[in-house]
Amino acid sequence: WWADWAAPGRGPYDDPDIMAAVAKFVEVGTKSLACPDRSPAADLAVIIDEPSFLYEGLSRTLDWPLIYRQRHWGLSRTGAPYDLYLLDDLEKLPRPYRCYLFLNAFHVSAAQRKIIDSKICRDGALVAWSYMNGAISDTLHPDNMSDLIGMRFRWDMTAWSLNMLLTGFDHPITQD
């Protein structure tokens, strides 16, 4: 999708070469809609949760390290294709994935926990969790994370900055 918000004849897309490229993109996109098999090819499903933003502080400083950094700096370095889904869409996934990465699922309802347990955590799938996933159910408590993830947690309220990044870029799998 593209939009040229400027007045006619003065926008950044007002260039014959750019518009020729846009026309080609539209042509390719339109043809792809007629492909018989348009199912996802990725083995990794990345899950984000829009309502979890409501449980952040007003500064919303968690979005940058948990979502944007991971998507633009971490996941892009893996070279592995991934599909992006909302936590609310877990029941509608088109097929099982080999790996699931939950980026910001702070609040996970009882119904979502059942779906994760019955549909996601099965058949040898790898499930990776980031910061505070499942911490909120009816209340905020580390036992909520333990129930969801299957590990014991305790909290340390020491203030610190949140940085979760892929490191070790000398390893062959993460080299440019």
Label every PLM stretch briefly:
Residues 8-11, 53-56, 92, 109, ...:
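Short catalytic/ligand-binding loop motif for oxyanion handling, primarily in non-cytosolic enzymes
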Residues 74-93:
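A short, well-structured beta->alpha microelement
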Residues 47-51, 87-88, 103-106, 130-133:
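Structural motif
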Residues 106-175:
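A glycine-rich, often tryptophan-bearing local segment used as a flexible ligand/cofactor-contacting loop or short
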